[in-house]
């Protein structure tokens, strides 16, 4: 089989610009004409269900898998099929079996996946889908999460729902999103605790992140001096806690009466160990505001739509405890990340985050 030839076409493979020099099969189990494998591609580990040609067929043939590669952690059995794939742009593969959602993680890293870790500790929060179980395997003495199951909650993708309101108002939905985000943050703070670090430490991390982005997109270098000045203006102690880490409209589901936050793995480009560190909850707030701004730039959407939605989200989240200076810092950080992404992937879109960068720096 030629995994190297096919994996470069998969959305979950994030190293498309790198030449594949080595593919090592770490674990495998055959199921008729397909094989479930953990394959180390260069330095990263991926879970695949491949045919004889090395092409991944997990979404189409998952019913063939009776038990996976790992140990199942749950009071109940692994859900039986038939499975219906949830289509969409995902870095993992999610399927539905009755009232259960099964998520196969694709890029496998050491440690309990934060999607499992966080959600299993806040099952009573009404704005998340409770975890039912997960499967993991031990490699080199460390646990690696392979699969998780959650209660399936039907809903509409938050991004798609937002775009259906472009000729009207998204304000009430945004307010509900703010309330949902605050509810999840409070639940995580209660369960995992809070801490604080000097503002200088936060600034150092943001500057290091910016320098990494400049390596990816040298065009950002002209904004470095001004951005560093904004970061260095932070003073005092910054409150930290466990957060979502990659919150945007597409990481939410709109049900009949509320919003559900999904995919708590954090920013995919960051190492898993880094994604599990406490961070400011305003990083999540900034991520959602940036997502609203993107939606506000689509055809038919008016500037007023975005402004009203932003205000409503902050009202729902609770502005009494919100540090506007710190929020602006995280908006700048997110927008700089978006500029680097758009330069390398969708240059026609770079004006959207670039406007946000200039607005904060002005």
State where each predicted segment sits.
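Short Lys/Arg-enriched alpha/beta "domain-start" segment
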Residues: 1-27
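Conserved ATP-binding subdomain of kinase catalytic cores across diverse folds
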Residues: 30-211, 257-258, 272-298
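Protein kinase catalytic-loop region centered on the HRD/HxD motif
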Residues: 187, 234-241
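Active-site catalytic-loop/activation-segment of kinase and kinase-like phosphoryl-transfer enzymes
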Residues: 194-232, 309, 340
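Pre-DFG segment of protein kinase catalytic domains
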Residues: 242, 261-263
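Catalytic-loop of the protein kinase fold
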Residues: 242-245, 249
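Conserved protein kinase catalytic/activation segment
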Residues: 251-261
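Active-site activation/catalytic loop segments of kinase-like enzymes and analogous catalytic loops
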Residues: 259, 266-318, 332-349
